[in-house]
Structure formats: C-alpha cells, structure tokens
C-alpha cells in the first residue's frame, strides 16, 4: 500500500475486523477460525524453513492465502477471476509472497509432511479454510482433504 494514509486505514480496518471476530468467538471454535485463512499452508512454509528469517510470518501467510485460493479454485469453490484479482492486488501494493516457488509442484509437494503437523487436523485429514469470493470463506472444517488427495492436487495448484 503505497500511501501512508492508505496504509494506516488498512491497518485500522484490519484490526477492527480482527476485533469483531475475536470478541464474538473467544475460544476460537467457530467464527474466529476465519482469521486462520492461509495459515495452514503458512505454518507448513514456516516449519519447512525452520522459522528462519528467509520468510516472514506475513509473507508465509500471503503465500498460504494464494495457495488456499488456488485450492479453492480446484475444488470449484472459487472462481479463477478471484485468484487473479487478489494476485493483482498483491502485485499493485508490493505485497511479497514466494512467487517463484508457488508455481513449482515439487516445492508444493515438499510442504505435505509439514501440513500433516497442523494442530487443526483430524482423522488423518488436513482442514482448510477456502475462499468463495473476496470477504467470504468456507465454514471452518468444511474442507477436510486427505494427504493423498492433496498430493494429487499439487501439480494442478502449481499451474494457476
């Protein structure tokens, strides 16, 4: 976000949105889980990088959000134009994500062992929050995907 005024507005707006969700779901059992969008992939990225300074938490989350949106497109929960809109927003505002790796199916597959470690998983399935459109995610725990299914999606994810 190029202008300081716009940046301050975006930060205030983000904080107010987060406060809205946290105050209505203090135990993180339902509505508040929406704030985890992108974090399943992000935490895998951070673990893979040994929490090094190569990638910040914010960059990992931005990358995780793009991967989650790509998965949303594959699952036909989201339209590709939404993915393009968000990628354009990132680019326009110089928001960094690991673009060079995000289209590499081997790199995406290398996240699988770390995705298995996510605390939100159950029954050998990985829980993902997917995006339907800007501002609207899936209900928590709606998309449970096995590691085998996700492995099949890796090549497709890399194409978008």
Across the structure, where does each feature detected by a protein language model lie?
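Active-site segments that bind and position negatively charged phosphate/pyrophosphate groups
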Residues: 1-109
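C-terminal charged capping/lid subdomain of soluble metabolic enzymes
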Residues: 77-160
């Amino acid at each position: 976000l190029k202008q300081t005024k716009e940046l301050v507005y975006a930060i205030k707006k983000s904080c107010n949105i987060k406060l809205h969700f946290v105050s209505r779901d203090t135990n993180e059992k339902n509505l508040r889980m929406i704030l985890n969008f992108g974090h399943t992939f992000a935490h895998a990225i951070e673990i893979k990088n040994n929490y090094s300074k190569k990638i910040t938490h914010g960059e990992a989350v931005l990358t995780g959000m793009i991967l989650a949106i790509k998965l949303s497109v594959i699952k036909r929960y989201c339209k590709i134009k939404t993915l393009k809109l968000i990628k354009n927003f990132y680019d326009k505002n110089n928001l960094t994500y690991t673009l060079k790796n995000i289209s590499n199916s081997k790199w995406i597959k290398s996240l699988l062992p770390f995705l298995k470690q996510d605390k939100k998983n159950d029954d050998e399935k990985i829980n993902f929050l997917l995006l339907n459109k800007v501002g609207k995610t899936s209900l928590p725990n709606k998309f449970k995907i096995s590691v085998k299914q996700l492995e099949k999606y890796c090549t497709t994810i890399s194409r978008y």
